[in-house]
Amino acid sequence: MAEEENKKFKVNANDAVNLAAEQSKSTSDKNLPEFGDMPIPDDTANLRKGPNLHDGLLALLPLIGVWRGQGQAAPPGEEEFTFGQQVVFAHDGENRISYDSRTWRMDDDGKPTEIPDRRESGFLRINDDDEIEMILTHSDGMVEILYGSPLNERAWQLESASTMATATGPTNLGPGKRLYGLMPNNDLGWVDERLIDGEMVPWQSAQLSRVVG
């Protein structure tokens, strides 16, 4: 998986920079809402605003932003469905990135419904050896720790090292593997594989466009 996906996300550097500059014309002035009255910096999802990104996070810099789009999910025991998603990667100047994901169901015509779906939140860090760690909590009652590394400057792969479900949490989802990567059009793509009945199965994936940052 890693080698194939690594090739998928590789692009010409100059083309990527030029495309990013053009796309940023509609997103560069947007950011997360600010409280403005806290004694510490507000979170920012825009590298042009707020505190500077910590030097230790430079290998994860392309993720910073708010991303929105659609994906497909096929949970065990359920029919495949389409979902909408918003993902926020933000920072506050410290050596950590906050992560938040909200999803909602789409109807058969591809239109968003008012039915909320899964939520996730957590934090990412990366050390001097380019080892990424992610702490992730799932709204359906699961907590996991993932470790990984960059595949290149535009793609990052993580694998579960520890997964724990609550008493009412999912019992049919085992350890997982998750890949994030910027596609040739600079959309953020991701796919999540899970150990289901002894086999790693892709059960969630999405393609998201930048709306902030």
Swiss-Prot record:
Note the Pfam families from the entry. THAP4_heme-bd
Q: Fetch the InterPro entries from UniProt.
A: Calycin, Nb(III)_bact/plant, Nitrobindin, THAP4-like_heme-bd
- Quote the protein name from its UniProt record: Ferric nitrobindin-like protein
Motif GXWXGXG location, chain numbering = 65-71
Q: Where is this region: Disordered?
A: 17-42
Lineage runs:
Bacteria, Bacillati, Actinomycetota, Actinomycetes, Mycobacteriales
Give the originating organism: Corynebacterium jeikeium (strain K411)
Q: What family does this belong to?
A: Belongs to the nitrobindin family.
HAMAP family reported in the protein's UniProt record: nitrobindin
CDD domains reported in the protein's UniProt record: lipocalin_heme-bd-THAP4-like (cd07828)
